[in-house]
C-alpha cells in the first residue's frame, strides 16, 4: 500500500476562527492573505516532514479566506459543520455565498462531517443554533495545534463568536462543551495566532489591520487576561513549540527508518499510525536495550581492569589502558543514547501506539470519545504531545463510516492480540513469562555475586586468624601479602559484579514488568470471557467491554511510561 501523508504521518492541524463580515477592501484583503500565507510558509519550512491540514467550517469571511490561501498553497482542508449541511447552508445570506461555499466544499480533502452535538434532527432554535456554533468552535480549538484568528481584537458577548472561541483556546473550553467534563482536569489551553482584521459592521480595531501577535494566557495575572507576544509558530516562546518538534521528529523517523516499508492496508489513520509507532518503538527499544547492555559490559570490563591494575600482582600497569578504553567506550555509548533520546523515543512511541490502538477500536464501535481526554493528562509536561497527536489522528478518522461488524471484530481482535502478547499463544510463552524468567535469571546472578563476596570475605577473616596464629602455614612471609591482596581483589570483583547486576535489574525493570504484565494478562483474559458470556447484543457488549478495558490500558500504560522515565540510560554504578 502506497504512503498517504495524511494517514501515515502525524499532521499539524490548523484551525481557523474569525469574523464573518470581514472588511476585505483590496489593501486589507491582500495584507490578511499575506499574513495567513506567512504562517503556512513558516510551518512548511520549519517542519518539512510534517503534513499540514486545515480545519474550517467555511463560514463567510475568515473561514473562507484562510481556506482559499490554503488551497493556493496545496494544503488540504476538511470541513467540520455545526449542523447538517442543508441546515448550515441556510445561514448564508445570498445565493452567491452559498455557491462559494459549495465550490470550496468540492475542493475539500473529504466530504464535510457534522460534529456530535446535543441537537435533534430538526432545524434548531436560535439559541440552540448559537450553541451549535460554539460546539464547532470548541471542536476546532480542541482538534487544532495552530489556531489562526482573524479578529479585530475587541471583546463581544456573543455565544460561539470569534472572541468566544479565542477565550476557549486561551483559557480552556467550558465544561458544557466538553465530551468528558471533569472538574479535576487542567483546562486544555494553547496559543492563538492573531491577525488583526477589521469588520464591516464595526470599523474599530485594537491594532493596525494585518498586525500579528501570539495570544497566550498570562498565568501571573488573575481573571481572564492574556498576553500578546510577537513570535512565530514554533518559536521557543510558542507554548506548542515542543509539540511541533516531537511531531516532526516522529515523521522524520518514519522517513529515515521506515523508508520503503509498506503501509498497513486500511483507510484508518489511527490504525496506520499505530503500526508506524509500533515499528519505531521497537527500533528504538532495540537501540536502548543494546546501549544498556554495552554499558553493562563496558563498565564490567572497566571495573575488572581497574581491580587487576590495583590488585596483588605487581607490574600490571598496562591494565590501566583497557580500563580507560572501556570507560571511554561507555561514555561514548551513554552520550549517543542520550543525545539520540533512544529510550525516551522508545517510550514515547510505545505510548503513542497504545493510545492510537485504543482510539481505533473505540472509533470502530462508535464510541466517539477521544483518548486525548483520558491519556497522560496529569503526567509530565514533556508527554503532552502524545495525547495531542492521538487527538489529531482521531480527527482524521471522523470521516470514516460506521461498520458494526468491523467494529465488533476489531474489539475481539484487539483483546485477543493483547492477551496473546502478554500470555503467549499457548498461555505460557508471552511477555509475562519472558520478563519473569529474566527477573529470575539476573536475580540469581546478583545473589551468586553477593554470596561470592560473602564467601571471600569469610575466607579473608579465616586467613587473618590463621595467619595470626600460625603464619608458617602460608610458606614464605611474602605469601601472606599475596593471599591477603588476592582475597581483597576477589571481594572487590564480587562487589562490582553484584552492584552491576543490581543496577541492570533496576534499570530493565524485569520484576516490575512481570508483575504488571501478570495483571494485564488477567484483565484481557477476563475481557475476552466477558465478551463471550455477555447477554447484551454483540455491539453493546463490545462497546461495554472495550470502554472499560481502554480506560484501564491507558492508565496502566501511563504508569509504565512514568516508571521508565524515572530510570533513564545512565552510566552504571559499580560502588
Question: What function would you assign to each model-found segment?
Answer:
Residues 52, 149, 168, 193, ...:
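Hydrophobic transmembrane signal anchors and adjacent membrane-proximal interface regions, especially
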Residues 1-216:
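Acidic/glycine-enriched connector segments
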Residues 221-451, 458-575:
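Conserved non-transmembrane functional hotspots
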Residues 15-17, 56-62, 67-70, 108-109, ...:
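Small-side-chain structural scaffolding
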Amino acid at each position: 500500500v502506497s504512503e498517504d501523508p495524511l494517514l501515515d504521518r502525524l499532521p499539524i492541524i490548523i484551525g481557523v476562527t474569525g469574523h464573518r463580515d470581514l472588511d476585505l477592501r483590496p489593501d486589507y484583503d491582500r495584507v490578511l492573505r499575506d499574513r495567513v500565507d506567512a504562517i503556512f510558509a513558516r510551518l512548511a519550512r520549519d517542519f518539512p516532514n510534517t503534513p499540514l491540514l486545515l480545519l474550517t467550517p467555511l463560514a463567510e469571511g475568515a473561514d473562507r479566506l484562510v481556506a482559499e490561501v490554503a488551497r493556493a498553497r496545496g494544503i488540504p482542508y476538511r470541513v467540520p459543520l455545526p449542523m447538517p449541511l442543508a441546515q448550515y447552508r441556510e445561514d448564508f445570506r445570498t445565493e452567491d455565498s452559498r455557491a462559494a461555499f459549495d465550490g470550496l466544499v468540492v475542493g475539500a480533502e473529504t466530504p464535510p462531517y457534522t460534529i456530535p452535538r446535543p441537537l435533534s434532527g430538526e432545524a434548531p432554535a436560535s439559541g440552540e443554533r448559537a450553541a451549535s456554533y460554539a460546539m464547532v468552535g470548541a471542536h476546532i480549538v480542541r482538534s487544532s495545534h495552530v489556531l489562526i484568528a482573524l479578529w479585530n481584537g475587541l471583546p463581544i458577548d456573543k455565544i460561539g463568536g470569534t472572541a468566544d472561541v479565542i477565550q476557549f483556546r486561551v483559557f480552556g473550553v467550558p465544561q458544557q462543551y466538553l465530551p468528558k467534563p471533569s472538574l479535576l482536569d487542567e483546562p486544555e489551553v494553547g496559543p492563538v495566532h492573531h491577525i488583526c482584521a477589521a469588520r464591516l459592521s464595526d470599523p474599530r480595531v485594537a491594532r493596525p489591520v494585518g498586525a500579528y501577535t501570539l495570544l497566550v494566557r498570562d498565568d501571573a495575572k488573575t481573571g481572564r487576561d492574556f498576553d500578546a507576544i510577537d513570535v512565530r509558530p514554533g518559536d521557543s516562546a510558542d507554548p506548542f513549540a515542543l509539540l511541533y518538534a516531537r511531531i516532526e521528529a516522529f515523521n522524520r523517523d518514519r522517513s529515515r527508518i521506515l523508508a520503503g516499508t509498506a503501509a498497513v492496508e486500511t483507510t484508518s489513520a489511527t490504525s496506520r499510525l499505530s503500526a508506524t509507532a509500533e515499528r519505531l518503538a521497537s527500533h528504538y527499544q532495540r537501540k536502548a536495550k543494546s546501549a544498556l547492555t554495552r554499558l553493562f559490559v563496558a563498565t564490567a570490563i572497566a571495573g575488572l581492569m581497574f581491580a587487576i591494575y590495583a590488585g596483588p600482582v605487581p607490574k600490571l600497569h598496562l591494565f590501566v589502558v583497557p580500563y580507560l578504553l572501556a570507560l571511554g567506550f561507555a561514555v561514548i555509548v551513554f552520550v549517543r543514547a542520550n543525545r539520540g533520546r533512544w529510550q525516551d523515543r522508545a517510550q514515547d512511541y510505545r505510548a503513542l501506539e497504545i493510545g492510537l490502538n485504543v482510539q481505533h477500536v473505540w472509533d470502530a464501535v462508535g464510541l466517539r470519545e477521544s483518548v486525548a481526554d483520558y491519556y497522560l493528562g496529569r503526567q509530565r509536561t514533556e508527554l503532552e504531545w502524545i495525547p495531542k497527536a492521538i487527538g489529531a489522528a482521531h480527527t482524521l478518522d471522523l470521516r470514516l463510516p460506521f461498520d458494526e461488524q468491523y467494529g465488533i471484530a476489531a474489539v475481539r481482535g484487539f483483546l485477543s492480540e493483547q492477551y496473546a502478547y502478554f500470555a503467549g499463544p499457548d498461555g505460557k510463552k508471552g511477555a509475562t513469562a519472558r520478563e519473569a524468567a529474566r527477573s529470575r535469571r539476573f536475580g540469581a546472578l546478583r545473589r551468586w555475586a553477593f554470596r561470592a563476596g560473602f564467601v571471600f570475605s569469610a575466607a579473608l577473616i579465616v586467613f587473618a586468624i590463621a595467619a595470626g596464629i600460625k603464619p608458617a602455614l602460608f610458606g614464605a612471609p611474602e605469601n601472606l601479602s599475596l593471599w591477603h591482596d588476592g582475597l581483597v581483589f576477589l571481594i572487590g570483583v564480587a562487589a562490582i559484579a553484584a552492584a552491576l547486576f543490581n543496577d541492570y535489574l533496576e534499570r530493565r525493570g524485569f520484576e516490575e514488568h512481570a508483575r504488571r504484565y501478570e495483571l494485564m494478562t488477567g484483565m484481557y483474559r477476563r475481557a475476552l470471557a466477558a465478551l463471550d458470556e455477555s447477554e447484551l447484543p454483540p455491539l453493546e457488549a463490545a462497546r461495554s467491554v472495550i470502554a472499560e478495558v481502554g480506560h484501564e490500558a491507558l492508565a496502566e500504560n501511563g504508569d509504565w511510561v512514568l516508571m521508565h522515565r524515572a530510570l533513564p540510560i545512565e552510566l552504571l554504578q559499580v560502588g
